Amino acid sequence: MQVNEYFDGNVTSIAFENGEGRATSGVMLVGDYEFGTSEKELMKIVSGKLEAKLPGEPGFRAYPAGSEFRIDANQKFQVRVIEPTAYLCFYS
């Protein structure tokens, strides 16, 4: 396992690998963030609420707990975290 912190500690993730492949589990505190991808990602919102502006979309869309979204490799996307949010991200 590897622990990573981003944005002055406001985003923390733990990277791991299991039978489903590589993944990170993490928490994002309230704030606005921009992320870049190096490979395809499936982001699942476990708890909390955020809004994301994905590549090619005209604006932000709400993603509450239980929802998910996909991002292709080599893309940037923006996130507005409305309340502290836990996520699980799978890479492929």
From Swiss-Prot:
<dbReference type="GO" id="GO:0047975">
    <property type="term" value="F:guanosine phosphorylase activity"/>
</dbReference>
<dbReference type="InterPro" id="IPR014710">
    <property type="entry name" value="RmlC-like_jellyroll"/>
</dbReference>
<dbReference type="InterPro" id="IPR011051">
    <property type="entry name" value="RmlC_Cupin_sf"/>
</dbReference>
<dbReference type="GO" id="GO:0009032">
    <property type="term" value="F:thymidine phosphorylase activity"/>
</dbReference>
<dbReference type="GO" id="GO:0005829">
    <property type="term" value="C:cytosol"/>
</dbReference>
<comment type="function">
    <text>Catalyzes the phosphorolysis of diverse nucleosides, yielding D-ribose 1-phosphate and the respective free bases. Can use uridine, adenosine, guanosine, cytidine, thymidine, inosine and xanthosine as substrates. Also catalyzes the reverse reactions.</text>
</comment>
<dbReference type="GO" id="GO:0016154">
    <property type="term" value="F:pyrimidine-nucleoside phosphorylase activity"/>
</dbReference>
<protein>
    <recommendedName>
        <fullName>Pyrimidine/purine nucleoside phosphorylase</fullName>
        <ecNumber>2.4.2.1</ecNumber>
        <ecNumber>2.4.2.2</ecNumber>
    </recommendedName>
</protein>
<keyword id="KW-0328">Glycosyltransferase</keyword>
<dbReference type="InterPro" id="IPR009664">
    <property type="entry name" value="Ppnp"/>
</dbReference>
<dbReference type="GO" id="GO:0004731">
    <property type="term" value="F:purine-nucleoside phosphorylase activity"/>
</dbReference>
<comment type="similarity">
    <text>Belongs to the nucleoside phosphorylase PpnP family.</text>
</comment>
<dbReference type="Pfam" id="PF06865">
    <property type="entry name" value="Ppnp"/>
</dbReference>
<dbReference type="GO" id="GO:0004850">
    <property type="term" value="F:uridine phosphorylase activity"/>
</dbReference>
<keyword id="KW-0808">Transferase</keyword>
